Design a protein with these regions (language model features):
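Acidic/His-rich, divalent-metal-binding segments that scaffold phosphate/diphosphate chemistry
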Residues: 1-129
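Generic signature of intrinsically disordered, low-complexity, basic-rich segments
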Residues: 2, 16, 200, 236-240
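Acidic, proline-/serine-/threonine-rich low-complexity intrinsically disordered repeat tracts
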Residues: 225-236
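Short linear clamp-binding motif
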Residues: 236-251
């Protein structure tokens, strides 16, 4: 299982908070930025350690995986938005701020409710080893879809969203969510989605999830850690050799 160091978890959290500050203006009297920061402060301790999924063969099923995934998708939505724009797609009927808002909060429900985590550690060694179920759903909280809980949390903190943001957030999971089918598969001209925000978000989410899975499957993190350990070991050996030389022959 991939593991982030405490320093990496803190660094990712700092990046997330800075992204919120950079994206949303201080628009008094309805200061959405202030409300968002209040919400993130409330969830900080838990959100920092929240995984992005419960199974290791899905994506980012490790402490800190949620924030890491959110940083990935917010990066990818901007890249994909640029690709769509350069190739002639209509992207002028929604804003980049709306795009980032939806990307930031489409999986917010994974943090759980106001008091309890959505994911708890699986206490079954058999399921962890044989099925990769690192986490399980917390039976102490009310069942909701991740999207429904995300919207509920946002309204609890008084955070308003535009129609574009709502649809983008609501539809980020694409056809993996059965309830989204009527939005994506609609034969009526009048009822088809009128902006591309949901398509861009879904592409970015798929891209982030797939890349995270590929990195886990290849063992990229383990290889990186092994290299870092090897470099550290060589550095320590070099320091020890230099110290021994000085002790034998002086400065």
């Amino acid at each position: 299982m991939k593991e982030l160091t405490p320093e990496q978890i803190q660094e990712n959290w700092n990046k997330l908070i800075q992204l919120v500050k950079d994206t949303f203006p201080e628009d008094y009297p309805d200061n959405r930025r202030e409300k968002l920061l209040k919400m993130y402060h409330y969830f900080e301790e838990r959100m920092c350690l929240t995984p992005a999924s419960g199974k290791e063969h899905f994506h980012n099923a490790h402490p800190g995986g949620y924030v890491e995934h959110i940083l990935h998708i917010t990066d990818f939505v901007q890249q994909i938005h640029d690709v769509w724009s350069r190739n002639g797609a209509t992207v002028d009927n929604f804003t980049v701020e709306e795009l980032i808002f939806a990307a930031l909060h489409h999986d917010l429900g994974k943090v759980g409710n106001l008091a309890e985590d959505n994911y708890i550690h699986n206490d079954s060694d058999w399921h962890r080893k044989n099925q990769g179920m690192i986490y399980k759903h917390n039976p102490r909280i009310e069942y909701m879809t991740i999207t429904d809980r995300a919207i509920w949390i946002l309204q609890h903190f008084g955070i308003k969203m535009t129609e574009n943001e709502y649809l983008g957030l609501r539809l980020t999971d694409g056809l993996y969510e059965e309830a989204n089918k009527t939005y994506y598969v609609n034969w009526s001209k009048d009822n088809q989605l009128k902006t591309n925000i949901a398509y861009i978000l879904h592409q970015a989410d798929m891209m982030a999830s797939k890349i995270e899975y590929d990195q886990w499957a290849r063992g990229d993190h383990d290889i990186k850690v092994e290299k870092e350990v090897e470099v550290q070991k060589k550095t320590e050996q070099s320091k020890a050799a230099n110290q021994a030389f000085k002790e034998l022959f002086g400065e």
